[in-house]
Amino acid sequence: MVAHVGAKIVMVDSQKDCVEMDYEKLADAITERTKVIVPVDLAGICADVDKVREIVNRPEILAKFRPANDIQRLMGRIAISNDCAHSFGALRHGKMAGEIADFSSFSFHAVKNFTTAEGGAMTWNLAFGNAVVPRQQVYCGSPVPFIEGETWNEFIYRLSQLFSLHAQNKDALAKTKLGAWEYDIIGPWYKCNMTDIMAALGLVQFERYPSMLEKRHKMVAMYNAGIDSLNAVLDADHQVKYLNHKGPDHCSSHHLYLVRLTGRSREEANHVIEQMAERGIATNVHYKPLPMMTAYKAHGFDIADFPNAYHLFENEITLPLNTKMSMEDVEYVVENFVEIVKGL
């Protein structure tokens, strides 16, 4: 979407041996043209949005900010749009994912903890949300019809509908009202709306989600215990590291179980993946860094500029984690993983 609207993509390397971005490198990457920062909640662990907020509020960063529309002027600083695709149900510093940043986006894709088969949701938390929009707004070169008395919260909701429905100013139901056939298309925008059927699936999932999260917590605890036992017999240079999904200031959604075979190469990690597959266990890698992908190479990105991200990738394996698995399944995965890693 960043490229689609004509904005420039800027990537920041991760911290050394940590999946969160390097926040000081983030500060160095900010220019007068920076409009939004997108921290990612990898594996369901909330990023440190409070740290990002502290950075964008630094006097020297505020002095660089050049707003380009009324929302940016009202914010008075760079916006923070949190990628919460993995973190539905997670919290950090007592706040839930979706209420921490200015804007947050969730994915309800089929492989997510909470699914509607496809689609997602967006939340926002703006101090001026209930203020009235004073004048017509223009987005992506297209004037958005002005509604007298509309608040900014209402406007952002309407704008989201327009962006996701070919910029049509009426949905299918509205067009069926008596004498209300006519509609307008205000811009060459997108088709990515969630259907009512998908939303119905989500409403049912809400009832089950707390128990699903609880099971994920138990599965991760079993994985942790198994790997702790493995590390007790491995030498210090070849420990298996896993993400900390729960601590005094955070609790993740326990979406993915990432491990790193420290001191090992990508080839050795791939060997483990192949050995696990031979035993009927599907594993994954999260993720191959974006600068290694063709689309981003074409934008001029080079993985050599992101050594920490590459270091995280070069020996990472993701063990299976979903609520269709039984605790016996988790035990089977652990037993085989331990046996294979010991044999490296």
In which residue ranges do the predicted regions lie?
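PLP-dependent aminotransferase-like
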Residues: M1-C84, L91
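Short, structured coil segments at secondary-structure junctions
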Residues: V5, I100-A101, H238
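Structural detector of well-ordered beta-strand residues that form the stable sheet scaffold
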Residues: V10, A79-S81, S105, K241-L243, ...
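A short alpha/beta connector and helix-capping loop motif
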Residues: E20-L26, G94-S104, Y332, F337-I340
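Active-site acidic short loop of glycosyltransferases
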Residues: T31-K35, G94, A101-D102, E314
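PLP-dependent aminotransferase class I/II
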Residues: V36-V40, I45, V49-R53, L91, ...
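Conserved active-site segment immediately N-terminal to the catalytic lysine
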Residues: P67-T116, I147-E148, W181-I185
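Short glycine- and hydrophobic/aromatic-rich loop-to-beta-strand nucleating segment
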Residues: S105-F106, T115, G120-T123, A199-L201
